[in-house]
Amino acid sequence: MVRNTIFGASFALLALSGAAVSQERVVNVFNWSDYIEPSILEDFTKETGIKVVYDVFDSNEILETKLLAGASGYDIVVPTASFMARQIQAGVFQKLDKSKLTIIGNTWDMVNERIAIYDPGNEYAIDYMWGTTGIGYNKKKVMERLGTDKIDSWSVVFDPASAAKLADCGIYMLDSPTDIIPAALNYLGLNPDSKSADDLAKAEELMLKIRPSIRKFHSSEYINGLANGDICLAVGFSGDMFIAQTRAAEAEQGVEIDYSVPNEGALMWFDVMAIPADAKNVAEAHEFINYMLRPEVAAKASDFVTYANGNKASQALMNKDITSNPSIYPDAATLAKLYTITPATPKEQRGFTRTWTTIVTGQ
């Protein structure tokens, strides 16, 4: 776990109206790396007097381990919805008190309906951001090695011959079996939501063929790797790729990054805000979620992280380059290519973990 100390220091802005230190209001947030506009937290503290203690993680597995162990110390966490389903069954979360979420009407029915697959009735979570898992790449480096600067197929990474051509300039993949294995299954023409041992074995066989060409499995380092021109391709989250694209453009070093939702399809996922069952600051957690539901706040968050959000009312306030980009807010043709995955049972999850360990270690 990475402690973002600047948040703990800068956003501890308290209304000191004679209140003792022991009475200070706090909300402890555990969110993904590079996943919020810092001034949002500062503004929340200025308005409410609630100190934000903000920690970050870079994989659902890290978050889940903490939650299942209990006594995490967090009041707000941001799991991916497909993970949240089994966490709800394990009693990890408490139901939201929607009477305290006074502007919940700003949420988007389309997103709520999809999240309800994992959280029936939308009782435990509110969407924060959503996006796709696809391919970000350095156009110049890919052109030099593959003879094209437009990627439209997963074959660029899953075909061993293609992957080998890119190995020297660097391929990164998410350290996430629930993102990469479904992509491999989908490429093989299998059900990306399959949990069967036979299908996992086929995905493992495919991944082991390209394993020598993969420089690293990591769920955040690829952002700067792409932006700095240190790697040529990454399989990762859509918004991260656009962050890399923006950073590369700002650096003015001739690095041009693009993002592709391949023709074969890609995973559509949802990151949600939820309150752990053992949260100590439940009122503050609801106040934080309600603040994040403000259209102007959701718009600022999306503009910063370049992800779509589940707040329909925010879209009119967002950067039009984001809302008009079909790789961020998919049009009908792009949506038709996207798939979602259903929750895995504990036994199925162990199968994923074993397969993933074999893939990452290469043996």
PLM regions with names:
Residues 271, 276-337:
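Mature extracytoplasmic/periplasmic domains
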Residues 224, 332-363:
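Conserved C-terminal helix/tail region of periplasmic/extracytoplasmic solute-binding proteins
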Residues 94-105, 155, 251-267, 276-278:
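Short beta-strand->loop
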Residues 78-84, 88-213, 218-227:
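Extracytoplasmic ligand-binding site segments that recognize negatively charged/polar headgroups
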Residues 83-86, 233-254:
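A ligand-binding cleft/hinge motif common to bilobed small-molecule-binding domains
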Residues 23-87:
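Early extracytoplasmic/lumenal segment of secretory-pathway proteins
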Residues 200-209, 215, 253-274:
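Periplasmic-binding protein-like
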Residues 74-79, 215-216, 232-237:
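Paired acidic/hydrophobic, glycine-rich loop segments that form the ligand-binding mouth/hinge
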